Each structure stands twice: as C-alpha cells, then as structure tokens.
Regions:
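Juxtamembrane loop-to-helix connectors within ABC transporter transmembrane domains
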Residues: 81, 99-145, 232
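Hydrophobic alpha-helical transmembrane segments of ABC transporter permease domains
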Residues: 20, 73, 121-166, 247-258
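An intracellular "coupling" helix at the cytosolic face of ABC transporter transmembrane type-1 domains
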Residues: 9-12, 105-106, 122-131, 135, ...
Length: 564
C-alpha cells in the first residue's frame, strides 16, 4: 500500500541536512546577542578607549563574520529546503495522480470530480506549504526557544524560571484555543469542498436551471454555503486573534517584571550589558512564539490535507491492476455469461443468474428498459467491475485470468457521449497508437465516417487542437467511430450509436457496422429497432435476467417501433 509517509521518508536524508543547518543557525543566532552584550560591557567600562580599541575591533569583526556565516547558511538552508520541497510535492502529485488513474470504477462512482480536483491542487499545495515553510519554521523556533532558555539559565536562573512559567502559560493557551481553531478550520475546508461541488453542479446544469427558472433557488443555496463558510472562517480568526494579545501581554509582563527586579536590586551582578542581553533574548524568545502562533493555521491545513491525501491513496482494494493476469494478444469475440449475478457496492441486485453467449463474428443487440442493466452488462464485459458470482469467459478463458490491459486492448467501446481530449484531431482518433498511423490513413478513416469535410475547415487539419466544444454531439459520435476503426479490434460495443446522428450519417454508420466490421463481434445497446437492422441475436434485459429474442419480436405499432 502506498501512503504519504512512505513518499516523505524517501527524502529523509535531505531534510535531515536542513535540520542540521537549522540547529547551527539557531546556535549562531543565540550567540550574536552575547557578542553585543560583551561589546556594551567593554564600552561601559572605565578603561580608556585606546586600550579597548583592539578588543572592540575583534568583537565587531567576530559579529560581522558570524552574521555573514549565518546569512550563507540561511541561503543554503533555503535553497536546499525549496528544492527538496518542490521535488517532494512533484513526487506526491505524480504518485497521487497515478493512484487516481489506477482506481477501479467502483471507487470513481463514489467520488465527486471536484473532490479529486481539490485533493490534487489545494491539498497538495497545503502540504508543500506545511513541509517547506511551516514545519521548518516551527522546528527553528523550537530549537531557538530551548537554546534561549539554556543561555538564560546561565545568565540568571530566576529569569529562566520566569520565562519557562510564561511559556507554559502560553502553550496551555495555544492548545486550548488551538483545539477550537482546528475544529473551525476542518469545518471550513469541508464546507469549501461542498461549495466546489456546488460550483461544478451549477455549471453542468446551467441550461436546466434557466429552463425551469430556478436561478433564485440556486443563488440562495450558494449564499447558504458561502454564509456557512464565512461563519467558520470568522470563528477561526476570532479565536486566532486572541492569541496575539495574549502573547504581547505576556512578553511585556516578563520584560517589566525583570526590569523591576533589576531596578529594585533584587538581582545581583546585573549591569547594562546583561539587561540588554536579557531583553534581547526575551524579544527573540517571543518572536518565534509569535511565528508559531501566526502560522498555526498552516499547521491545521497541513495536517488536514495530509490526512485527506492519505485517505485518497486508500488501500490496495481501491486499485485496479490492469497488468495482473494472462497477457492475451488476441480475443476472437466468443463471450459467455454463466450464472452471473452482480450489484454495485453491495446495493440492490442488478443482475441475477444471467446466462447468454455471443459467438465470434456475431452482431448482437442488447435491449431493455432504462435501468434494466444493459450498461451494467457492458461494464462487466469491459472488466470495470467484479461480478458477485458466476463466470464470464472470453474464448473459454475466465475474465479474471485475462489481464485488463489485454481485455481492453481487444475491445472498442463507442460511448453515447464520447469525450474529446484537449489535443490534436489525430491524437483524438489514434489515442495511444499515434506512431502506427500515417496522415493518409487518418484521412481515409475520417472520410469513411463522414468527418473529413468538417476537419478540412480547420486551419491545421488533423493537427488542429480541439476540445469538447469543437464538435457537435453527432460529430463526437462520428469521431468515436473513427477511434474504434483506428483501434481495429475483434470486439466492438456501441451504446446507441445513432442517437445523435442525422439520417445521412446514420446510414453511413450502419454501413460501417455491416461492411467494415463484418468479421468482428459487434454488441449494440439499442432503444430503437432501426438501430439494430441485420443483427443475428437480440438479448433483452428484464427482471434482472437476460432473455434471448429473435428479430421477429420487433413489432410496428402506429408507425412507431418498440421492443417486445
């Protein structure tokens, strides 16, 4: 099983180097105020300036050199950290995308597209921010706080105790308020995801929204989601706003208390240099604390996003291994269902003890009412889902023994609503076999399906970059036929192949099925009898079973056609 922890651990040595640099830089930053303290003590002494000139020059030189070294180390740390973080994020995004591509259809059917988009964009960016900026800042701040407390204990143990007690007070406050902040941030992210889902639904259903005049209802629902998001965000920042004054009050209280103790003579052996050192360390002590409070939101976002990416990667049960099984070079189209039963995600049964066979080279119509299970049978043939019981065989081989890569390589599936990739027309036809097709062969296929004239209207011909909006529904179906012909398989499955096509092109498609694919096994999901002229067999799906019909069962009633 792949998880986020394994990916991060691949970079552990690179990040250990960053941690080492953080510790060295923190040590240097702790040492710098001490140099200034020594300089102040030297200047304030009764010694003549000429006598301390050499020592003063040495202290200033040490300070400048140390500062320069610190700057160089900071540069190295930032460069290494940025490179490591970018490599890590690239690795996470690449691994996550591969994982999504390997999901089985059952997993996809239970997920929103916007959820996947959010995981691949916002969540991975949050992880990058968390690992590349927030976590190093917290580590640096934590190391520096410990070093400051150690040095302060040597300067004056009472001062160190005061700072430790104050730190405990601040930590308790942060944890108490932070618990609420974590809840508010989690709810805000969940609501934002719902809002993203709603955006996608809004744009997909825009025509329906206008047809039924429900713009106001949709608008109100958007306002409800936005208001809920605003409410959680406001509560989060209200809680966060309490932390800053708490930090400031604690800081000023400590400085005031220490100065008071010094002025009242409660602390022995305190000079101006020591007071500077103490005040400087207090400032430096609260600066990282302030950073930690200010970036507390990033911790919450990072933790939530890491959990969500881990959830997305899931377990191996969600994964479809297309290479598992026998690599069969050619399937001839002998398909047999034996006592097949199936239900989606253990829900209501769709098919029960289904039995039928399709022979090599047969043309078979798959008919039935909407929701009867026609598409389900096709999904099972394509290996998108595992059956609950029974057997499906191809040329006598069990479907589970054939690799999905081999299975799908031998089947062309023409969907009712084909997808057009944002790529060239040629790439949209050959998909993953571009090197084996000359331009002339692609043009011949376009002429065969009746799309050639359309393509000649494009400036770059078959190399024109197209997308979903470049073709009408009917033209998309013709493009899908071109894909199927280019794939050149032994089994073809058509989902209502002429539903979006005019009469002229409908006849073209029928000719292709009859002539071009005459030696192939053809399965046609059909709702109209005209679609399945010249088929050899009709399989009707009804009552979770498959009944074998003949073409004589197609009757004409009042110039309309229906299946019986």
């Amino acid at each position: 099983m792949i998880n986020l922890k394994k990916i991060i651990l691949k970079y552990k040595y690179k990040f250990l180097l960053v941690i080492l640099l953080i510790i060295i830089i923190s040590l240097i930053n702790t040492f710098l105020p001490y140099i200034i303290k020594q300089t102040i003590a030297l200047v304030k002494s009764d010694v003549v300036f000429h006598d301390i000139k050499q020592k003063l020059f040495s202290l200033v030189s040490v300070y400048l050199i140390t500062t320069l070294i610190c700057a160089i180390l900071e540069f190295l740390k930032s460069t290494i950290l940025a490179k490591n973080t970018q490599d890590l994020i690239y690795d996470i995004r690449k691994t996550t995308y591969k994982r999504i591509m390997d999901f089985n259809m059952d997993t996809f059917s239970n997920m929103h597209i916007s959820t996947l988009v959010t995981r691949m964009t916002s969540d991975i960016s949050n992880i990058g921010e968390f690992i590349g900026r927030t976590l190093p800042m917290f580590l640096s701040s934590g190391v520096f706080l410990i070093l400051v407390l150690i040095v302060m204990s040597f300067v004056n143990i009472y001062f160190a105790i005061i700072m430790i007690v104050s730190s405990i007070f601040l930590v308790v406050a942060v944890l108490k308020i932070g618990k609420k902040m974590a809840y508010y941030k989690k709810r805000e992210i969940e609501i934002t995801e719902n809002l993203n889902d709603y955006f996608g639904e809004t744009f997909s259903s825009i025509k329906t929204t206008h047809i039924f005049n429900i713009q106001n209802e949709r608008r109100q629902k958007f306002i409800d989601y936005s208001s809920a998001e605003l409410s959680m965000s406001t509560k989060y920042f209200d809680s966060q706003s309490i932390l800053t004054p708490v930090r400031s009050i604690t800081r000023y209280f400590i400085i005031s208390l220490i100065l008071y103790l010094c002025l009242q003579g409660k602390v022995a052996n305190i000079d101006i240099g020591v007071i500077y050192l103490v005040v400087s360390y207090i400032d430096k002590f609260f600066e990282p604390l302030g950073n930690m409070l200010y970036h507390y939101e990033d911790i919450q976002k990072g933790k939530i996003s890491m959990h969500r990416i881990d959830e997305l990667m899931g377990t191996d049960e969600n994964i479809e291994n297309i290479y598992q099984g026998e690599n069969t070079e050619k399937l001839y189209g002998n398909i047999k269902f034996s006592n097949v039963s199936f239900s989606y995600s253990n829900k209501k049964s769709i098919l029960e003890n289904v039995n039928f066979s399709i022979n090599e080279g047969e043309r078979v119509a798959l008919i039935g009412e909407t929701g009867a299970g026609k598409t389900t049978i096709v999904n099972l043939i394509l290996g998108f889902y595992k059956i609950n019981s029974g057997n499906i065989t191809f040329d006598g081989k069990n479907i589970d023994d054939i690799s999905l890569e081999s299975l799908r390589k031998n089947i062309s599936f023409i969907q009712q609503s084909p997808y057009v990739f944002n790529d060239t027309i040629k790439k949209n036809i050959v998909v993953n076999n571009e090197n084996n097709f000359s331009d002339e062969k692609i043009i011949d296929i376009l002429k065969l399906v009746g799309l050639y004239n359309k393509v000649t209207n494009f400036k770059n011909g078959i190399y024109e970059i197209v997308n979903e909006n470049s073709f009408s529904k009917g033209e998309k179906q013709l493009l899908a036929f071109a894909r199927a012909i280019a794939k050149d398989t032994s089994i073809y499955i058509f989902d209502e192949p002429t539903s979006n096509i005019d009469v002229k092109n409908e006849q073209t498609i029928k000719n292709i099925i009859s002539e071009v694919l005459k030696d192939s096994t053809v399965i046609i999901i059909a709702h109209r009898p005209a679609t399945i002229e010249n088929v050899d067999k009709i399989l009707k799906v009804q009552n979770k079973k498959v009944v074998i019909k003949s073409r004589k069962n197609i009757v004409h009633i009042n110039n309309s056609e229906k299946f019986t």
